């Protein structure tokens, strides 16, 4: 049985069930769950499916479930296609997802009669709309669960002032425009509650929006990114109260003071239940979870069901239905074990399957054909002017407030742009406005287009004004070569697990720190950000000094719940420092960040501490057919490459093959070892330097020179020269000669040091000379990575190199086919910054960087 939609009364189509005025009004099969007394209850004819029904004239599109499956495929396909098409323009996911949703709406394909009739009939729209709303609620819950509410109290005072100014000024300006143009608005938008809702929506920037866009732009771990998230979080906390006030105003418009009273009573009861019952339940779940494990699956299912229950309760109490999942998420202890388990178990399904239906729901209500001249003039111009004023005042107030608090101009402009980003939370607010009849579908369309345009324009501008890696390049020498002899040398040691740490400690002891030439080590443990929205960088020494303060105790809580693997690394750091405190000072850190952003913590630490080099373990690739216990984290592969590209100092990559036994670790329990230096066990270790010329090899030779003072090390330096000086750079040759001469004069009387020269014509002869060296006699191979090497010496070898982290020679001696079992150390010297820069404020503009797509995938 079928029913016809009334053509002239579109108000009967409830928006939250997915029946949009832009959809075709042709006959269609519908469910009887349409709550309107003006529409008769009808029955749907049930079809019995038959085997091979398509060959008997049966149409699968007559079934709601079959139609829903086709719709799911179309929605996800459109969004992915738009995402790929917009990637070269550096657009975040939210822009492509909204446009993909609009493609199936009346603005594009939804305006085609047959497209709606066969693929998006009303009954299937009803299913899609409800799934889309569920996607919204779970997205808000997950984002809130990653939010560190405790960071609000620890936020710097200037963040609070900037957040307040960036909200108050737009409220005053947008509110003034709204009141001045009130006579030009339709009767629904003229209400004080409606104008107030629009004003607050344009004045606040949602934390979930900032988090998702900055995550897509790889700016979560940047200074401005952290600044923006802190300011947005402060605004969101005020926004929680604004939502309650706004809902109370809408109840006052309908039911007066009596309705407002019972609404507030319901809010208090719901909030008390969440704080007194739900929060304690979460704490109990955490206490029942063994350290280092995921939360029990049954608890996760109960929490995800609780999201739906919170939606039901807030809707029943008259609150915005989104308040429930947000409040519930804020009560979840962020980070491991509960927050991280929720993210691992549900994030992919929510983001990649449920959320596309959310954007389809948004797109179905967006109809650009509503923007006609008379509609624009009579209804939409006040709303449009309010959005423009909101953007301008939000940008100017935030930027000038940041400048007042001595934030650099470039960062202030970037912060002002970030505070204008719009996204998922705003879309849900617009849908809520339709439900409350604050705006009609023309006004809703204006706000959705405002979200798309502002975010699409703002994100490239942010990239244009702000490059987080720009400060890492220093114009000062920060190298091993330029660190004076017999002075303290600083280095950053970056590790991700206990296995790689033992090899790096072995190397540090062979670097032979002494009282006269000590090492200052800044050891940072890299931990993947899980169950948290904001990156966390912990200085363990500072924590000890401030452990009596309450906020430090709160910050320590998520770390107590980390796996035992993290405790092992920190314990190893402490043990190493205790046994070598006369010649080594060590300060330990833990960096929680997304894997693709870990390099920023490493580079910022090296820059701030003015270290000579960064020491990294070589990250092996994962083998597809290997057992899970044998696999090394594939996400760490990009960390070394990013550090090599953006480093503010020299970099050493250590490939531990296990040949160098960690004698020092075994001797660490021996309290009678020398205090002047770290003596190895009485065994001689043979190191070799493959010197091919260039800055990187000069840096490697200076590091090897420090090792040569170790009485347990014999060092061989082999310099490769091209036949007839072919392909040599005169400047590099002179610099190489100077360093080699200095090294030989310094070590001429050292019987444990030898020097040789080999003349080769091409890469084949270079490789043959290396293989003829009794390669299995050497415990450590040291070489430069690539800079300044005579290309003639490597001719023919570059095509066989597979790993650019190690360079051509490093990759050759590290390969499994190479006969040596010795470990490999590859050195890259600092590339100093040439003064100047790119961007508008420097008078230069790199269009390639501006238009090139982001290299990472959106996770």
From Swiss-Prot:
Biological processes, Gene Ontology terms: potassium ion transport; proton transmembrane transport
Localization of this protein: Membrane
Phosphoserine found at: 857
Any one GO CC term of the record: membrane
Membrane disposition: Multi-pass membrane protein
Region (Disordered): 538-566
UniProt superkingdom: Eukaryota
Keyword match Cell wall biogenesis/degradation: no
Composition bias, Acidic residues: 546-557
Gene Ontology molecular function: any one: antiporter activity
Gene3D superfamilies in alphabetical order: 1.20.1530.20
Bilayer-spanning residue ranges: 64-84, 92-112, 122-142, 161-181, 194-214, 227-247, 258-278, 291-311, 312-332, 348-368, 384-404, 438-458
Name of one Pfam family that matches: CHX17_2nd
Keyword tags: Antiport, Ion transport, Membrane, Phosphoprotein, Potassium, Potassium transport, Transmembrane, Transmembrane helix, Transport
UniProt keyword annotation of Coiled coil present: no
Tissue: Specifically expressed in pollen.
InterPro entries noted in UniProt: Cation/H_exchanger_TM, CPA2_transporter, Na+/solute_symporter_sf
Function comment: May operate as a cation/H(+) antiporter.
Family membership noted in the UniProt record: Belongs to the monovalent cation:proton antiporter 2 (CPA2) transporter (TC 2.A.37) family. CHX (TC 2.A.37.4) subfamily.
Protein name: Cation/H(+) antiporter 24
The gene coding this protein: CHX24
């Amino acid at each position: 049985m079928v029913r016809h939609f009334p053509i002239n009364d579109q108000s009967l189509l409830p928006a939250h069930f997915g029946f949009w005025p832009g959809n075709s009004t042709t006959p269609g099969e519908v469910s009887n769950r349409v709550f309107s007394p003006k529409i008769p209850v009808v029955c749907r004819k049930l079809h019995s499916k038959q085997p091979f029904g398509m060959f008997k004239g049966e149409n699968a599109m007559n079934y709601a479930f079959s139609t829903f499956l086709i719709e799911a495929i179309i929605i996800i396909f459109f969004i992915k296609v738009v995402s790929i098409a917009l990637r070269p323009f550096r657009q975040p996911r939210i822009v492509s997802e909204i446009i993909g949703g609009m493609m199936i709406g009346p603005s594009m394909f939804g305006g085609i009669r047959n497209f709606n009739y066969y693929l998006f009939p009303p009954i299937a729209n009803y299913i899609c709309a409800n799934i889309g709303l569920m996607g919204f609620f779970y997205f808000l819950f997950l984002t809130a669960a990653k939010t560190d509410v405790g960071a609000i109290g620890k936020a710097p005072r200037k963040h609070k002032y900037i957040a307040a100014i960036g909200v108050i000024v737009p409220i005053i300006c947008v509110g003034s425009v709204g009141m001045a143009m009130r006579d030009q608005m339709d009767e629904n938008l003229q209400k004080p509650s409606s104008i107030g809702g629009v004003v607050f929506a344009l004045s606040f920037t949602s934390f979930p929006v900032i988090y998702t866009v900055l995550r897509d732009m790889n700016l979560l771990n940047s200074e401005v990114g952290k600044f923006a998230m802190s300011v947005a979080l402060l605004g969101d906390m005020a926004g929680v109260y604004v939502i309650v006030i706004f809902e109370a105003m809408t109840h006052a418009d309908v039911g007066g003071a009596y309705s407002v009273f019972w609404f507030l009573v319901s809010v208090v009861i719901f909030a008390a239940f969440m704080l007194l019952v739900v929060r304690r339940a979460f704490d109990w779940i955490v206490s029942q979870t063994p350290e280092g494990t995921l939360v029990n699956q049954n608890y996760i299912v109960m929490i995800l069901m609780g999201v739906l229950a919170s939606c039901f309760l807030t809707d029943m109490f008259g609150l915005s239905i989104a308040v429930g999942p947000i409040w519930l998420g804020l009560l979840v202890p962020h980070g491991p074990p509960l927050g991280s388990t929720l993210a691992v178990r549900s994030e992919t399904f929510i983001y990649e399957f449920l959320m596309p239906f959310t954007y389809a729901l948004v797109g179905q209500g967006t109809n650009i054909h509503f923007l006609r001249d008379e509609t624009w003039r009579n209804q939409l111009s006040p709303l449009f002017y309010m959005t423009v004023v909101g953007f301008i005042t939000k940008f100017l107030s935030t930027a000038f407030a940041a400048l007042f608090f001595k934030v650099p101009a470039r960062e202030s402009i970037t912060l002002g742009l970030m505070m204008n980003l719009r996204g998922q939370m705003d879309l849900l607010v617009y849908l809520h406005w339709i439900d409350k009849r604050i705006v009609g579908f023309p006004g809703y369309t204006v706000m959705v287009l405002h979200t798309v345009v502002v975010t699409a324009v703002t994100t490239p501008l942010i990239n244009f004004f702000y490059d987080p890696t720009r400060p890492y390049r220093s114009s000062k020498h920060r190298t091993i070569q330029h660190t004076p002899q017999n002075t303290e040398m600083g280095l950053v040691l970056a590790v991700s697990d206990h296995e790689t740490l033992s090899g790096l400690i072995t190397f540090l002891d062979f670097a032979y720190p002494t009282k006269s030439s000590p090492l200052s080590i800044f050891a940072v443990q890299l931990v993947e950000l899980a169950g948290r929205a904001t990156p966390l960088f912990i200085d363990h020494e500072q924590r000890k000094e401030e452990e009596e303060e309450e906020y430090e105790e709160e910050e320590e809580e998520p770390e107590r719940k980390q796996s035992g693997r993290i405790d092992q690394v920190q314990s190893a750091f402490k043990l190493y420092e205790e046994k070598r405190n006369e010649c080594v000072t060590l300060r330990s850190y833990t960096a929680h960040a997304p894997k693709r952003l870990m390099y920023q913590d490493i580079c910022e630490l090296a820059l701030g501490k003015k270290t000579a080099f960064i020491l990294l373990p070589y990250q092996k690739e994962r083998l597809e057919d290997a057992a899970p216990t044998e696999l090394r984290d594939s996400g760490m592969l990009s960390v070394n490459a990013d550090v090599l590209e953006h480093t503010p100092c020299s970099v050493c990559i250590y490939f531990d093959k296990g040949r160098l036994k960690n004698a020092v670790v075994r001797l660490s329990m021996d309290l009678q070892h020398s205090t002047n230096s770290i003596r190895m066990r009485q065994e001689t270790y043979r190191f070799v330097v493959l010197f091919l010329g260039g800055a990187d090899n000069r840096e490697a030779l200076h590091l090897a020179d420090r090792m040569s003072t170790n009485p347990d090390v014999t060092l061989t330096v082999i310099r490769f020269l091209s036949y007839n000086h072919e392909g040599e750079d005169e400047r590099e040759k002179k610099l190489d000669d100077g360093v080699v001469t200095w090294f030989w004069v310094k070590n001429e009387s050292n019987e444990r040091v030898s020097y040789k020269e080999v003349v080769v014509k091409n890469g084949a002869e270079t490789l043959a000379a290396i293989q003829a060296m009794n390669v299995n006699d050497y415990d450590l191979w040291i070489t430069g990575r690539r800079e300044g090497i005579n290309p003639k010496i490597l001719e023919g070898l570059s095509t066989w190199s597979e790993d650019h982290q190690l360079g051509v020679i490093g990759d050759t001696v590290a390969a499994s086919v190479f006969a040596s079992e010795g470990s490999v150390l590859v050195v890259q010297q600092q590339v100093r910054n040439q003064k100047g820069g790119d961007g508008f404020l420097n008078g230069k503009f790199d269009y390639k960087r501006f238009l090139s797509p982001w290299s990472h995938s959106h996770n």
